[in-house]
Regions:
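Extreme N-terminal starter segment of soluble prokaryotic enzymes
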Residues: 1-5
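Active-site nucleophile/metal-coordination loop of metallo-enzymes that catalyze phosphate/sulfate
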Residues: 11-160, 164-167, 191, 199
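Extended, H/D-rich, highly charged conserved domains that either
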Residues: 159, 167-233
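Single conserved hydrophobic/aromatic residue that forms the stacking wall/gate
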Residues: 315-325
Length: 325
């Protein structure tokens, strides 16, 4: 194999995993349930790739014409993005990251506040879109940063760009990352947003501050064998950039796929690793199956140009037909 493209589509699951009961996910099947919610789907590329043969998806034929398809379950403990990406990259982990359903310890927040000079509001389990609507006005008037978590091991800090610059938000998250290490927190996430009350919107300048993988991955092995790897999207946030030849930020799935196609045609890399986030960020967490279908159409169109070189993988759920919070 001279070149490989690995695409991770955030949240697009094809059925519950064997350990679904541990995470409250019995009955989950994101692709199938989105199809049910929309009547049926018209996704010719996904159909060509054989997704209708993996699980029952209204509108997609149960046949495989140009690919080899299958369904995998994680061997690692945990169901978060970091764990899933690491395992796709060849690193199995046996220790769950810590989660904080009741909020983070006051001593952790006090340490971060003391060093950064910023106070926090929130500190509870919430959807990102919901919490900026709930606390956005208070944040604008007080200057205090919005802190929240989710079902994953994430320490998320949201700030309006008129209150805190993106660079300063990144600096605060980088400091927070150091303190979060001792609490076994998987990711610190910067969540900048814009807009006015009633119309707050998160931007694509999100940045994840993860943990360096504690073992070998496909990226480290390729690097040691003289191969060049390109990370597109949040790959460098989850794996670090030590073994990437280059890393490119994206402004959504359409932009990410356009970058992938352009870079592939330039033929400068051996391994192309991309993460597509819109289904998760824009539609899954907002419980919007109609929007999710529109997002699938964008991906379907982009994949049409890549069928002959795809190594397609899906990771975790944030299913718009199932409440997450």
């Amino acid at each position: 194999m001279s070149k490989c493209i690995l695409i991770v589509i955030d949240s697009l699951g094809v059925g519950e995993a064997p350990d679904a009961e541990n995470y409250g996910d019995i009955g989950a099947n994101t692709f199938g349930n989105v199809a049910k919610a929309n009547g049926q789907l018209n996704l010719p590329t996904f159909e060509k790739l054989g997704f209708g043969a993996i699980t029952n998806i209204n509108g997609l034929k149960d046949e495989v014409t140009c690919s080899i398809v299958g369904k995998l379950a994680e061997s690692s403990k945990g169901n978060d993005s970091t764990t899933g990406h690491w395992e796709i990259g060849g690193l199995i982990t046996q220790r769950d990251f810590s989660v904080f359903p009741k909020g983070f310890p006051s001593e952790l927040i006090d340490k971060i506040s003391s060093e950064t000079g910023h106070e926090f509001i929130g500190n509870y389990h919430a959807s990102g879109t919901e919490i900026i609507n709930e606390l956005g006005e208070e944040h604008l008037s007080s200057g205090k940063l919005i802190l929240y978590t989710s079902g994953d091991s994430v320490f998320q800090i949201a700030a309006h760009e008129n209150i805190l610059s993106i660079d300063d938000l990144y600096k605060i998250c980088k400091i927070s990352r150091e303190y979060c290490n001792e609490y076994n927190i998987g990711r610190v996430i910067a969540r900048p947003f814009i807009g006015d009350k009633g119309n707050f919107q998160r931007t694509y300048d999100r940045k994840d501050f993860g943990i360096t993988p504690p073992g070998e991955t496909i990226l480290s092995q390729l690097f040691k064998n003289g191969k060049n790897s390109l990370g597109i999207g949040k790959i460098s946030d989850l794996f670090g950039d030590e073994f990437l030849s280059n890393s490119i930020h994206t402004e959504g799935d359409k932009n990410g796929l356009e970058i992938l196609i352009s870079e592939y045609e330039d033929n400068r890399y051996d391994f192309y690793f991309i993460n597509l986030v819109d289904l998760d960020m824009l539609y899954g967490h907002r419980e919007d199956p109609a929007g999710y279908y529109e997002g699938l159409k964008i991906i379907d169109n982009g994949l049409d140009k890549l069928i002959s070189v795809l190594n397609l993988s899906l990771i975790h759920i944030s299913e718009p037909t199932r409440p997450l919070y």
